[in-house]
Amino acid sequence: MAKAKFERTKPHVNIGTIGHIDHGKTTLTAAITRVLHDKFPELNKASAFDQIDKAPEERQRGITISIAHVEYQTEARHYAHVDCPGHADYIKNMITGAAQMDGAILVVAATDGPMPQTKEHVILARQVGVPYIVVALNKADMVEDEELLELVEMEVRELLSSYEFPGDDVPVVRVSALKALEGDAEWGDKLMELMDAVDTAIPEPERAIDQPFLMPIEDVFTITGRGTVVTGRIERGVLNVNQEVEVVGIKPTSTKTTVTSIEMFNKMLDTGQAGDNAALLLRGLKRDDVERGQVVVKPGSITPHTEFEGQAYILSKDEGGRHTPFYNNYRPQFYFRTTDVTGVVSLPEGTEMVMPGDNTEMKVDLIQPIAMEEGLKFAIREGGRTVGAGRVVKILK
């Protein structure tokens, strides 16, 4: 059979399964691939459960995470789906954004209802900005009592509402991942119903190219007679020659300038877009006016800040992290995009210290401003060695 070619025509969405241990996240992931394979064989191959469960370890910024990646297609969309076998892997993945999610399938066993990790994953989803959730009420074949199913559904909705998800409107679909995986037609249909809910309740993400222009500066140099050139990889948006931009971060004030030329691989271009490695010639700026760590952006689209609340995972000793805990007023470097800035950490009330391998909330006060928005990722470093990773949850100043 000819290999199905990757069609660019379909919208692409990143999702993942979250929820308490043994509630059936991995079984559900395998069942989705099986049911979609049976329904659209030319679009999908089935993934075996044990392949997903024995997820290969990945190292992202020094953090070891087991993540299984599967892909599949519904009629409407192409999905990349992540599933993590261990609870610690989920926490690390969600905080560090190793695999970004546009939405999540929250798996809750109808036999148990919401459990501690269910709640923990929902809290994390809220904090790290997983924007949409669809609920799979799994093992529904094992609960005879309709009232009990309704009760569990109500509990899940209340849990979601208490963390600012629209609990009353979130789709809750009763499924049996195991039965569907075994090929039971009726439960297979319920799984299709779940995927229809995912298709409709998780909106298509805004593509990087449609967002406001942003390029982190990696390098700065002068071309005699022409001016100052900055290089970097365009993170989002589109830039045209002669467009006005703003240089933001590190320095106390932002600077507006015009891009008079865009080059890629030594060729002059009219435009640059998300994903391009580009060199931009900036009008009227001296070599000392710009530096690595700043960003070139669409004017007014992002602002510099020094204080934020973050959620971070601190590497364990085995991952090459610290061997000892840290305390209030810890002063590491925070690495944003292309540069390190020193920051002072304040721990939440009641937290005396943070151990290697923990995840924690923290308030950070940076000594220089960084172009920042909620969701921005950072690494925590000591002398160039990564000891943690996290993201901005809320900007304070």
UniProtKB/Swiss-Prot annotation:
Family matches, as CDD domains: EF_Tu, EFTU_II, EFTU_III
Region (G4): 138-141
Single annotated GO MF: GTPase activity
Binding locations of Mg(2+): T26
Region (G1): 19-26
Subcellular location(s) of the protein: Cytoplasm
SUPFAM superfamilies in UniProt: EF-Tu/eEF-1alpha/eIF2-gamma C-terminal domain, P-loop containing nucleoside triphosphate hydrolases, Translation proteins
Domain of life per record: Bacteria
Similarity comment text for this entry: Belongs to the TRAFAC class translation factor GTPase superfamily. Classic translation factor GTPase family. EF-Tu/EF-1A subfamily.
Designated name of the protein: Elongation factor Tu
Species of origin: Kineococcus radiotolerans (strain ATCC BAA-149 / DSM 14245 / SRS30216)
